[in-house]
Design a protein with these regions (language model features):
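Catalytic centers of hydrolytic enzymes
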Residues: 1-238, 244-253
Length: 255
């Protein structure tokens, strides 16, 4: 689904549109390998795409719980939608050899699967059974509600101009596919000046319209080494020397 907060004065009640639940902030200590599995689970939000098909294909997997789709900021990565999902919606391993997460990088370099990261999320994710999360080496719940953190940020900044930093995308091997998704009909007013999305027409769902995703080739891709490294490195392993290093910080957006 979507939320539509108009430009102009922002009321505290608008925070409920951005964050529905009374979760508290949590901190996880995980490895690069665990982060990859975390993202493999999140990739279940998207359907598998047949790049050779000329028929319209739906981008969003409607059976996947949208609040389980996480974006991990501080990293860059891509999803290969031609691959099947590795996990089902419950987190059960269904395709052991599948790998949708590509070009996973930290600070512009392929991620070290044994490196330790601190990830900020919420208590719902931290205490759940998510692949890559359930075996975290350390979990801490902080005395701070996520909604209050957003409110504090807005009050501190006075004026905010939120925008996506584009740290994730799709592997451009589906450039000829007709990929569709639904959103607000009002969203077409924001399509000017961009060429990644086009308006198709009204949807059969009340309050929605249908859009087409346009995937294009991009230059300067990070070399994808995550699959090779995962094959030679046991998932979740770390040496004593690696645990002594200061853990890099990443943040995660989880509903």
């Amino acid at each position: 689904y979507y939320t539509d907060i108009p430009a102009g004065p922002l009321a505290i009640k608008n925070v409920a549109d951005l964050y529905l639940y009374d979760n508290v902030t949590a901190l996880l200590k995980v490895t690069g390998a665990q982060i990859k599995e975390w993202l493999e689970m999140s990739a279940g939000q998207f359907n598998q795409i047949d790049p050779k098909s000329k028929e319209p294909q739906q981008l969003i997997n409607s059976s996947y719980r949208s609040y389980n789709y996480d974006v991990i900021d501080g990293l860059t990565y891509k999803f290969d939608l031609t691959q099947p999902n590795k996990y089902d919606r419950e987190g059960k391993l269904v395709n052991p050899d599948a790998s949708r997460v590509r070009d996973l990088a930290y600070q512009g370099k392929p991620i070290d699967l044994n490196q330790t990261f601190l990830v900020v999320t919420n208590n719902y994710r931290a205490t759940g059974n998510f692949p890559g999360v359930k075996d975290a080496a350390e979990k801490r719940l902080l005395n701070l509600e996520n909604r209050q953190a957003i409110i504090d940020y807005i009050v501190s900044e006075k004026t905010i101009n939120p925008s996506a930093d584009g740290n994730w995308s799709f592997v451009p091997n589906i450039t000829n596919a007709d990929i569709r998704f639904a959103s607000s009909d009002n969203a077409r007013a924001h399509l000017a000046g961009q060429d990644a999305i086009s308006y198709v027409g009204p949807s059969t769902q009340a309050g929605f319209a249908e859009y087409r995703l346009i995937v294009k080739e991009k230059a300067n891709q990070v070399e994808d080494t995550t699959k090779k490294e995962s094959e030679k490195s046991p998932k979740g392993s770390e040496t004593a020397d690696q645990t002594k290093r200061e853990a890099p910080k990443a943040t995660v957006g989880a509903s």
